[in-house]
A protein has these predicted regions:
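Ferredoxin-type iron-sulfur electron-transfer modules in oxidoreductases and energy-metabolism complexes
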Residues: 2-26, 41-65, 82-111, 153, ...
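Gly-rich Lys/Arg/Thr-decorated short loops/hinges at beta-loop-alpha junctions or inter-strand turns
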Residues: 30-32, 146-161, 213-225, 328-333, ...
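Conserved phosphate/anionic-ligand binding catalytic regions in large, soluble enzymes, centered on
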Residues: 33-37, 179-201, 300-312, 316, ...
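Iron-sulfur cluster-binding cysteine motifs and their immediate structural context
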Residues: 74-79, 480-486, 564, 574-593, ...
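Flexible inter-domain linker/hinge segments
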Residues: 113-181, 335, 341-356
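Hydrophobic alpha-helical positions that pack around
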Residues: 134-135, 264-390, 402
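Accessory "access/gating" subregions that flank catalytic or transport cores
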Residues: 164-205, 361-362, 367, 375, ...
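Short amphipathic, charge-patterned alpha-helical segments
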Residues: 239-241, 391-406
């Protein structure tokens, strides 16, 4: 790998890479993200390698193993360029057909194309699929185009040009001024203005200074940061380099969640390549700026995503938060000024420097600028990563991009912001997605988790789940969080078991406010949000559990009963065969019935009943 010592070297290198890429008439990209790996995309890639070698097409066709394009519901994903043909749910057996028909003859394979159920037609290009069409993909635009393990691919797309501009054409103060003017706010949850944070760190007394990338993404169902770091690690490194130059830091750390092996591997590969290319180390691009980066594996706890706990973890200590009266920008790693941003925040920096703050601030709303990546999961047809401009409505994300309800049940709510966020009812789906609007609704932006729930979801059970999760993840350092969440969990357990009484909801609310007001760190202060928002919008559901001893969503096992409709039952016997407690009785070809005293309420009978005769009440 060549050593880049100047902007001219960088430009010449890019020209050489682009010239080499010109020899390929066709490019095949195979998604190699964690989601598609669960669908055995590695085997699909190997099948392409074997088939291309067999057809002696290696010199004319480039095969790229890329990051996540976002449409995780449909993996493995394969795209053929320059035709821009998008194939989904590709299997190993499909590969020879793709090579012979699409690559060699330019023909589309119908059964691999996405089908728009509303329009009743096949769509060959990803950009015309509703899931992608309503998005504004700025940060994710290269995820499905580059091999994250090859710095050359990133350089070919203009990579490290923003770094060159910052180092050679701007002063540190000018970089900070540009970031402040862009209106970029931290994408990790707090929404603090990024430029102001950088300025505070630069002005803080003490040396050396540090920059940290937080990829300890612990929200259930969230994978935005993981996918960015897996798919385009050099964009994060470039952002960190620019930030370090602006702040005056010489050392950085990428803190990666322990459960993210591919993200850690690709980040380390990118760091090694950047060092060999002279883009990390001493005298970067001949500018006299020195900076290096190390990776650090997360401590495995959700609370390690909190800034002060993360700092402690990097230092080799137990990942416990400390009081917020001391900020990491003044006293962070080893007591020195430290600027900590999450993956998505760092990835925005090269875009802002390249395109300008005026361009960036033209996207979004008055107080929430740019785009935001969300992890759209739950009861929608299309799940995956979505990048949208700030200000888009929840309805547009859930129905236009997500495709609406998954199995015909009406959508009831969406939970945003992870365990610290809130549940927003369908009646508020016209709400714009920005920092202020979500906060006013009792939720938060958070890092970008978005869980869609339908009528089959019990909101009491949802509140109980998040309280239980946060109780387990609490460091236990402060009493309000440790004991308060434990007691809240006990109250919610009682309600779902039919043991709630007239005082349960009042006590639950009182405890929630105490935990929020008295806890030491952000985890405890925001932990009651799911409970408070569920009570605010779905109180009748809680009251039904307490007063009527019924679960309207038929989820809470102690409050439901299984029965068989005499009119609908065909007497096939499928239910009796799968019942683990032999609670189903009845003669063949005659209506069956369930013995309530034996029924374990496992739901197996309902799962196998083709006549839909099993009822839950």
């Amino acid at each position: 790998m060549r050593k880049i010592k100047s902007i001219r070297d960088l430009e010449n290198w890019r020209d050489e890479i682009l010239a080499r890429q010109q020899q390929y008439k066709t490019v095949i990209t195979v998604c190699g993200g964690t989601g598609c790996q669960a669908y055995h995309c590695q085997e699909v890639k190997k099948a392409f390698q074997k088939e291309l070698a067999k057809e002696k097409m290696g010199e004319r066709v480039s095969l790229k193993y890329t990051g996540c394009p976002g449409f995780c519901e449909r993996g493995p994903l394969v795209t053929i360029f320059p035709q821009d043909i998008f194939y989904q749910r590709v299997k190993v057996k499909d590969v020879p057909l793709i090579v012979s028909e699409t690559v060699q003859r330019g023909k589309k394979i119908d059964h691999l194309l996405f089908e728009d159920e509303r329009a009743h037609k096949k769509i060959p290009s990803a950009r015309d699929i509703p899931f992608y069409r309503a998005q504004m993909r700025l940060l994710l635009s290269n995820n499905d185009l580059i091999d994250p393990t090859r710095v050359e691919d990133y350089v070919a797309k203009g990579g490290y040009q923003s770094l060159a501009k910052a180092l050679l054409q701007m002063t540190p103060s000018e970089v900070i001024k540009e970031v402040k003017a862009s209106g970029l706010k931290g994408r990790g949850g707090a929404g603090y203005p990024t430029g102001k944070k950088w300025e505070n760190c630069r002005n803080a007394p003490g040396a050396p200074k540090y920059v940290v990338c937080n990829c300890d993404e612990g929200d259930p169902g969230a994978f935005m940061d993981r996918s960015l770091l897996e798919g385009n690690p050099h964009s994060i490194l470039e952002g960190m380099l620019i930030g370090a130059y602006a702040i005056g830091a010489s050392q950085g750390f990428v803190y990666v969640r322990h459960e993210y092996p591919l993200a850690h591997k690709n980040a380390q590969t990118a760091i090694n390549q950047a060092r060999r290319a002279g883009l990390l180390g001493q005298n970067i691009l001949g500018s006299s700026f020195d900076f290096d980066v190390e990776t650090a594996k997360g401590g495995g706890a959700f609370v390690c995503g909190e800034s002060t706990a993360l700092i402690a973890s990097i230092e080799g200590k137990v990942g416990e938060p400390r009081g917020k009266q001391i900020h990491t920008v003044t006293q962070g790693l080893w007591g020195k000024p430290t600027n900590l941003n999450n993956v998505e925040t760092w990835a925005n920096i090269p875009l802002i420097i390249r395109q300008g703050s005026e361009w960036f601030s033209s996207i979004g709303t008055e107080k929430s600028k740019g785009t935001k990546i969300f992890s759209l999961v739950g009861k929608v047809k299309n799940t995956g990563l979505v990048e949208v401009p700030m200000g888009i409505t929840l309805k547009e994300i859930i129905y236009d991009i997500g495709g609406g309800p998954q199995d015909g049940k009406a959508i009831k709510a969406v939970q945003t912001g992870g365990p610290s966020g809130g549940c927003i009812p369908a009646s508020l789906f016209e709400l714009p997605v920005d920092f202020d609007s979500l906060s006013r609704a009792g939720s938060m932006m958070g890092s970008g988790g978005m869980i869609v729930m339908d009528e089959g979801t019990c909101m009491v059970d949802v509140a109980r789940y998040f309280v239980r999760f946060l109780k387990e993840e609490s460091c236990g350092k402060c009493l309000p969080c440790r004991e308060g969440l434990k007691r809240m969990g006990e109250i919610l357990d009682g309600i779902t078991e039919g043991k709630g009484n007239g005082e349960s909801l009042g006590l639950l609310e009182e405890l929630a406010h105490v935990v929020a007001d008295a806890s030491l760190c952000g985890l405890g202060k925001t932990a009651p949000n799911p409970v408070l928002s569920a009570l605010r919008y779905f109180r009748p559901e809680f009251e039904a559990h307490i007063q009527q001893k019924k679960c309207p969503a038929a989820v809470c096992t102690p409050l439901i009963q299984y029965s068989i409709s005499e009119r609908s039952c065909t007497g096939c016997g499928a239910c009796s065969k799968v019942c683990p407690t032999h609670a189903v009785e009845g003669e063949k070809k005659q209506s069956h019935r369930i013995l309530a005293q034996l029924c374990s309420k496992c739901g197996s009978c309902k799962d196998v009943c083709k006549a839909n005769a099993v009822m839950v009440q």
